[in-house]
């Protein structure tokens, strides 16, 4: 935890650094000289950040006088300046609550979607973002970033501590045959992908630093979008109907409710990593939802033995990182705490950073706690009206799901059986007697808070 706290402290300091980039206008606003235009209200907020003690106090008073529409502005000011006493007092006046820091203020804001930001909010926030990285503007052109054009609340978009592509994607990275991957330990976890017989392994110790690969596997263009904060690596098909070329994704540097916002390089639309849908930009009204493909987290040893012809990601990524086992995000993964604020709706049965395996297919969604597989490796269940069987190993965070066609499966002496007949477990399907096959069902691992935050209202939770 001490290293996590140190990291968070450094992050807060880095967030506060752009304060020096806010140049104040010559005009000093007060009750005797109040702001009148949207642009002047932006300058009032700047005055509240960089003015003298009296000027800052006067600025907050002017913002508070405008009413609750200024709550998002004060929350942003708290983010930029740290726990500024005048801003905190202003928030208490408007909310009636003591919001001790930016995290608490963001949770309040998330819980109150009825609060519409003042028209000056956009200008202040873009000024803040561009002081960090001018390239951030490519995601928020005026014609696509108004409130009615976005699928998420602009006031809830938070800077994640890096610039555009500060977490670099791996695009068609160098691969090795399994026999040459001497850097890997048997117990290293990998994302295992197999499409049309083309098996690949992507170690989490590397992917944690990059959070995205764009590849063609088995002739299918795909991207693995890995949100380390959510514990979720989701494999998406990237060829979208109506587009000539597959989409290529990168990391924007932004978060929404502790989930990464990725972007496509063709249109600079922002996408929700968890849902595979555009939330801002030219593609937002195109009705696009990326198709999810199966992916399994498992140990390198288990993947290699099941897929001896597999290729695996090389350490030669073109980037310098510490790719050692268990290095990346070590403190965060070990902590029960979230790094960025978001409301956790329900922890009555499962804690926020407990792992679940989730499926959203067949017109329904359902999640299974990973710890459910401690009792039984095989779970016969259903998603919506479709029967499924899940095969799991909580020690390696591994779950694979398949349709079961009304059959009931069990594990006997390490062999999958139904009605006394053996079935082989492959990456594509279960294979049984008389060449019968049962298709693999796409799903993925995630922290509970992320699954519940994005799908909890419409999703069922296994309680067996």
Residues of each region from the PLM?
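Positively charged n-region of N-terminal signal peptides that target proteins for export
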Residues: 1-4
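Bacterial N-terminal signal peptides
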Residues: 6-20
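Structural detector for internal amphipathic alpha-helices that build alpha-solenoid repeat scaffolds
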Residues: 25-36, 54-66, 73-77, 85-97
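Mid-to-C-terminal functional-domain signal that highlights helix-capping/loop sites
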Residues: 27-28, 75-77, 96-464
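Stable alpha-helical elements in mature extracytoplasmic
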Residues: 41, 55, 70, 83, ...
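Buried hydrophobic core positions in alpha-solenoid tandem helical repeats
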Residues: 41-46, 71-77, 105
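Alpha-solenoid helical repeat architecture
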Residues: 45-51, 78-81, 109
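Second-shell loop/turn segments in exported
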Residues: 47-49, 58-61, 213, 288-289
